[in-house]
């Protein structure tokens, strides 16, 4: 039975944050003084597995593991393997900064991860450091991308948050890199999520401005729109030769009318909309001994409270991206 909200949207996709911690500090994601929650506040893998089983039973078929950085959570492959065995699970994917993929890519594939999205905001070492902090480098992320390709975690999607005057000049280089390696490259508009996200909105570039830079790099005739289903996400895709690029325009062309997703935070809150403050506590009833039927009722009630649209243009989200799972 499909999970349908009051606006007749089928909710089929859950983003699951397994950790608020991250080994990088990207300037649009978290401010330097921001501290992560204590691990004791996170759901255990046993608790998480029970909740994910309820979501699968209710009609969620696609799961994406996120963070923070999900690969800093020990024994993640064990969680994946258990999730992969659940009836109704169609796909498990992963969002990562790529730094730890050379170590874990093969095990993740064997456990049941189908594909990965990897963040790469700059190919230039100094630009990378300016955006992402002192940990990691473009070469280390590239190594993660190659490890994902070798392990068969495909298609590999590379996400670039585009900021005017910061990294927008690298768009042509990113397109070339994606074409050389057969990657799907996605450009993402900045969003006012958390203090860090609000601070970078002065560098906001719309998807139209981003696409214009792509056209300048490859020629207008070379950028061919792709129609038809391209997965459960909100990106609009274009073909450039044998590669693909996409744009995610949460600000300039929101996709709320077709939103199919919710988010489960590491501390057990169900976030109904990335741009709203609505959230439902699942950890407390879980730890107080709620039955499966009681958990199902809480989730079903939450789905009907999912808002019609985000309020990014009216107010910013106070929660940091690391606390929301992206």
From Swiss-Prot:
Family to which the UniProt record says this protein belongs: Belongs to the radical SAM superfamily. MoaA family.
Note accompanying the cofactor annotation: Binds 2 [4Fe-4S] clusters. Binds 1 [4Fe-4S] cluster coordinated with 3 cysteines and an exchangeable S-adenosyl-L-methionine and 1 [4Fe-4S] cluster coordinated with 3 cysteines and the GTP-derived substrate.
Listed SUPFAM superfamilies: Radical SAM enzymes
Name this polypeptide is given: GTP 3',8-cyclase
Subunit description: Monomer and homodimer.
Any one GO molecular-function label of the UniProt entry: GTP 3',8'-cyclase activity
Listed CDD domains: Radical_SAM, Twitch_MoaA
Domain Radical SAM core stretches: 6-227
Entry keyword Transmembrane helix: no
The protein's Enzyme Commission number: 4.1.99.22
Domain of life: Bacteria
Cofactor: [4Fe-4S] cluster
Keyword ATP-binding attributed: no
GO biological process, one term: Mo-molybdopterin cofactor biosynthetic process
The organism of origin for this protein: Magnetococcus marinus (strain ATCC BAA-1437 / JCM 17883 / MC-1)
Record keywords, A-Z: 4Fe-4S, GTP-binding, Iron, Iron-sulfur, Lyase, Metal-binding, Molybdenum cofactor biosynthesis, Nucleotide-binding, S-adenosyl-L-methionine
Family matches, as SMART domains: Elp3
Metabolic or biological pathway, per its Swiss-Prot or TrEMBL entry: Cofactor biosynthesis; molybdopterin biosynthesis
Residues holding S-adenosyl-L-methionine: 28, 68, 119, 191
Binding site for [4Fe-4S] cluster 1: 22, 26, 29
InterPro entries: Aldolase_TIM, Elp3/MiaA/NifB-like_rSAM, MoaA, MoaA_NifB_PqqE_Fe-S-bd_CS, MoaA_twitch, MoCo_biosynth_MoaA/MoaC, rSAM
Job description of the protein: Catalyzes the cyclization of GTP to (8S)-3',8-cyclo-7,8-dihydroguanosine 5'-triphosphate.
Ligand binding ([4Fe-4S] cluster 2): 256, 259, 273
Pfam families, per the entry: Fer4_12 (PF13353), Mob_synth_C (PF06463), Radical_SAM (PF04055)
Gene that encodes it: moaA
Residues that bind GTP: 15, 64, 95, 157, 261-263
Record's catalysed reaction(s): GTP + AH2 + S-adenosyl-L-methionine = (8S)-3',8-cyclo-7,8-dihydroguanosine 5'-triphosphate + 5'-deoxyadenosine + L-methionine + A + H(+)
